[in-house]
Curated annotation (Swiss-Prot):
Name of the gene: lacD2
PANTHER family per the UniProt record, alphabetical: SULFOFRUCTOSEPHOSPHATE ALDOLASE (PTHR39340:SF1)
KW Hydrolase (keyword) present: no
EC number(s) from the headed UniProt entry: 4.1.2.40
Protein name: Tagatose 1,6-diphosphate aldolase 2
UniProt keyword terms in alphabetical order: Lactose metabolism, Lyase
Source organism superkingdom: Bacteria
Keyword Disulfide bond (UniProt): no
Organism of origin: Enterococcus faecalis (strain ATCC 700802 / V583)
Annotated family: Belongs to the aldolase LacD family.
Catalysed reactions listed for this entry: D-tagatofuranose 1,6-bisphosphate = D-glyceraldehyde 3-phosphate + dihydroxyacetone phosphate
Molecular-function annotations in GO: 6-deoxy-6-sulfofructose-1-phosphate aldolase activity; tagatose-6-phosphate kinase activity; tagatose-bisphosphate aldolase activity
GO BP terms, alphabetized: 6-sulfoquinovose(1-) catabolic process; D-tagatose 6-phosphate catabolic process; lactose catabolic process via tagatose-6-phosphate
Length: 331
């Protein structure tokens, strides 16, 4: 069981519903958001990125327990959020250096946990790419790095949300059938690793342990797992950690993400909510770029709101409270 300080527990409460479910909105994307704008044949400006994040925050945080933003483009959006929504701030540099092996992590050079806290962060989020079967020397560097981060968050008494994204150094395409077959092992083993106490992680933000596009009954063509096998991987995932954990949406469609959460619940998963990003807001980028702020607001007030409210209904029916996974150290 995770032991929280009173300060971390209060911060966790600010990020969650009263029931202890995390229904958070992620728009800390930087590189991915720029790519979405570029795909519409427009060169993105910093002001555009800031404005889009601000609109999403203003229109959608009334329906979220918290919002995840980056301090590079997201601080105006943080100020525009609903007063009841908690704030997570990202601490990692976007992307990774593809020229060096190992996808080594890096921090934003201008920021520290103290400075993010001063900007109003209720928690710190860090993204780590991790391959459990990577060269041990590379993984050793990652372990040491996360130990430092955990200690820095503990010193400032802020919850540490670690986002883990799996990969295989030998498989280039993470959407392939080949990768789908090894994904359960990759996801569940890395969760075991980073649940160890030396990392001081409070919440794991993780992928679902299978590629749903290759699950029997969901797969358009080839399958990597039967429904029963997939369900077992979800159950194994919950058994791999005693920490609160939440699912990321990984850019899949709103419909598939909701179906996935239902499948997880039926399998016995004890996930504690979601940090859902593109599945909620990605279709708002086009009206924003092509028709401006008013068109984007219209989309967010209708389709965007519908996406988040229908997701909230599914989360309420499928997620478990993290309250049962923690105890508070009042000392």
């Amino acid at each position: 069981m995770l032991t929280l300080t009173a300060g971390k527990k209060a911060a966790m409460d600010r990020l969650s519903t009263q029931e202890g479910i995390i229904s958070a909105l992620a728009i800390d994307q930087r590189g991915a958001l720029k790519k979405m704008i570029k795909a519409l044949d427009v060169e993105p400006t910093d002001a555009q990125i800031e404005t889009f994040k601000e609109l999403v925050s203003k229109e959608l945080t009334p329906y979220a327990s918290a919002i995840l933003l980056d301090p590079e483009y997201g601080l105006p959006a943080a100020k525009a959020r609903d007063t009841e929504a908690g704030l997570l701030l990202a601490y990692e540099k976007t992307g990774y250096d593809a020229t060096t092996p190992g996808r080594l992590p890096d921090l934003l050079a201008d920021w520290s946990v103290l400075r993010l806290k001063e900007e109003g962060a209720d928690a710190i989020k860090f993204l780590l790419y991790y391959d459990v079967d990577e060269d041990p020397e590379i993984n050793h560097q990652k372990h040491v790095f996360i130990e430092r981060l955990g200690s820095e968050c503990a010193e400032e008494d802020l919850p540490f949300y670690l986002e883990l994204v799996s990969y295989d150094a030998q498989i280039a395409d993470a959407t392939s059938l080949e990768y789908a077959k090894v994904k359960p092992h990759k996801v569940n083993e890395m969760m075991k690793e980073f649940s160890k106490p030396q990392y001081k992680v409070d919440v794991l933000k993780v992928e679902v342990p299978v590629n749903m596009n290759f699950v029997e009954g969901f797969a358009p063509a080839e399958t990597a797992y039967t429904k029963e096998e997939a369900a077992n991987y979800f159950l194994e995932q919950s058994q791999a950690t005693d920490l609160p954990f939440i699912f990321l949406s990984a850019g899949v469609s709103t419909e598939l993400f909701q179906e996935t959460l239902r499948f997880a619940k039926e399998a016995g998963s004890t996930f504690n909510g979601v940090l859902c990003g593109r599945a909620t807001w990605k279709n708002g980028v086009k009206p924003f770029v092509e028709a401006g702020e008013t068109a984007a607001c219209d989309w967010l007030k209708t389709e965007g709101r519908e996406n988040i409210e229908s997701l909230n209904e599914v989360i309420a029916a499928t997620a478990s409270s993290w309250h049962a996974k923690v105890q508070v150290n009042e000392g």
